[in-house]
Regions:
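Sec-dependent N-terminal signal peptides
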Residues: 10-17, 203
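Surface-exposed, well-ordered secondary-structure segments
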Residues: 26-189
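Short, charged juxtamembrane terminal tails flanking transmembrane helices
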Residues: 215-219
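Extreme N-terminal export signal peptides that direct proteins to the secretory pathway
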Residues: 12, 25-26
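N-terminal signal peptide c-region/cleavage motif recognized by signal peptidases
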Residues: 20-22
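A short, hydrophobic C-terminal helix/tail in secreted or cell-surface proteins
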Residues: 193-213
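Bacterial N-terminal signal peptides that target proteins for export
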Residues: 2-11
Length: 219
């Protein structure tokens, strides 16, 4: 009876911990590409290198690896531009510097990220004071992050315990600066054992401990 009480107590504590974790579910912000990748499962990347340095009528339907999404801009212009410093590494920006560039995954995804910086009227990278990035998930949670003095290598990623439904970036009203994204990352969640699996693991550990004690008593 004592062993049964012990296992049940541990299992109950673990269940309460899982419930408490779920109650604080939401969106986590990452500013390191390696940390972001460590927090997600499979990831696809859209490099935008198939785009011409030209304008496109949005919204566009694209994919990052096997993960489809749409990208649009607004409210002032629906134009989307492929842009570059060297016509080799292409990035994506909007047609109006005041607009939001918004990404919407077509399938349930847990993470979105990329490299964010400013570009000028001609699409060349340019210094920006800040960019504002926002993500919303299927539970209604929304997180905004202000990326100060972004550079070409500034990475930001969002990971949700639910499914992300939209992600946007804007440069606000900074003269001569357009919000720009390169190497968009879309990711599924890391596989996490179900509560039942945790319970089986804990019960198994309790049984192993009991067997070990019985063997020592017999020795």
């Amino acid at each position: 009876m004592g062993i049964q009480f012990s296992v049940k107590s541990v299992f109950a504590s673990a269940t309460l911990l899982l419930v408490a974790t779920a109650a604080h579910a939401g969106i986590t912000t990452y500013t390191s590409q390696s940390s972001y990748l460590a927090a997600v499962g499979g990831t696809g990347v859209d490099t935008f290198d198939d785009l011409d340095v030209s304008d496109y009528q949005g919204p566009l339907t694209r994919s990052a690896g096997s993960y489809a999404y749409t990208v649009g801009t607004g409210p002032n212009s629906s134009q989307i531009w492929g842009a570059s410093d060297d016509y080799s590494d292409i990035w994506l920006t909007g047609g109006n510097r005041l607009d939001l560039v918004t990404f919407a995954p077509s399938t349930p995804l847990a993470g979105v990220g990329g490299f964010f910086f400013g570009s000028d009227l001609f699409g060349f990278s340019t210094p920006a004071s800040y960019l504002t990035l926002s993500a919303t998930d299927s539970a209604g949670a929304t997180v905004s992050y202000r990326l100060n003095t972004p550079t070409f290598n500034s990475f930001v990623g969002f990971v949700s315990t639910g499914n992300l439904v939209s992600f946007s970036v804007t440069a606000g009203n900074q003269p001569g600066v357009w919000a720009t994204v390169n190497d968009l990352h879309l990711s599924v969640a890391t596989a996490v054992p179900e509560p039942e699996t945790y319970g089986m693991m804990l019960a198994g550990l309790g049984l192993l401990g009991y067997i070990g004690r019985r063997q020592r008593q017999r020795a």
